[in-house]
């Protein structure tokens, strides 16, 4: 699928602002070289170490649900190859910042190379257990989780700013994409059914269920 066709198809799902952000990110720089001819197919692609780059429509829908704005500080859990972080970086702009936590060292290095090559300077890749969040920069306006947890990790709730929003898949074989809003209490709404790789960590799964 050509990039133009993919971008046009996304208009069926999300706001024009998200579509424009997606159009500015060169997805071919974030997939393994041998898969570049498939970079603009609307499906997940393997990036190694049992992980995938999410399908473009899913990245777009998660960004739309997050309602990302200029200047926001964002925590991403499950940074993978850096593609989703790049789209969010477009949406928060140069005055915002994305802190992306990834547990696999090789993917952290891959993402850093990809982001540098694509010239994204408002993304920081951090090696660590994403279920613990990243307290050094908390609280966050938005939290995006790109792997499915057994439940919403408590540290992520704590690191979400009052008035903030989190999008997270929850479940094992059957998963729900949840939108979590924090005000005087925590409100959780189901957005849709999804399929993500498991979130591994202290407040996640102990091992893959695939």
Swiss-Prot record:
Keywords annotated in UniProt: Cytoplasm, Methyltransferase, S-adenosyl-L-methionine, Transferase
One GO BP annotation is: protein modification process
Main location (coarse class): cytoplasm
Name assigned to this protein? Protein-L-isoaspartate O-methyltransferase
Q: Which organism is it from?
A: Methanothrix thermoacetophila (strain DSM 6194 / JCM 14653 / NBRC 101360 / PT) (Methanosaeta thermophila)
Superkingdom of origin organism: Archaea
> What role does this protein play?
Catalyzes the methyl esterification of L-isoaspartyl residues in peptides and proteins that result from spontaneous decomposition of normal L-aspartyl and L-asparaginyl residues. It plays a role in the repair and/or degradation of damaged proteins.
The cross-references to InterPro entries, in alphabetical order and at most eight, read: PCMT (IPR000682), SAM-dependent_MTases_sf (IPR029063)
